[in-house]
Amino acid sequence: MANIKSAIKRAKTSEKRRAHNASMKSAMRTAIKKFEALVELKDVEKAREAFIIASKKLDKAASKGLIHKNAASRQKSRLAKKLNSIQAS
């Protein structure tokens, strides 16, 4: 444990940020899993809504620095591909 006052504060702040970031990442992953579950069921309307939510969460995570912007873009592209595949069939 840190002894210097500023180091103690940094440790507390860092722990709060870590918990918040973990929560945001978890919500992002959950949104993606919900979308993928709807794709499996071939429910186009609900999948479209879930895609919008997942896209927003990915963009938010990228803007906050939780994931790289290219990683977010790549994941959104893959999700869009899945959505288009069920819309076509």
Swiss-Prot record:
Residues 1-25, 69-89 are annotated as: Disordered. One of its GO terms (biological process) is translation. The keyword rRNA-binding applies. Binds directly to 16S ribosomal RNA. It comes from the Bacteria. Belongs to the bacterial ribosomal protein bS20 family. This is Small ribosomal subunit protein bS20. Keywords: Ribonucleoprotein, Ribosomal protein, RNA-binding, rRNA-binding. GO terms for molecular function: small ribosomal subunit rRNA binding; structural constituent of ribosome. The keyword RNA-binding applies. One of its GO terms (cellular component) is small ribosomal subunit. Pfam families: Ribosomal_S20p. Residues 7-20 have a biased composition (Basic residues). The lineage of its organism: Bacteria, Bacillati, Bacillota, Bacilli, Bacillales. The gene is rpsT.
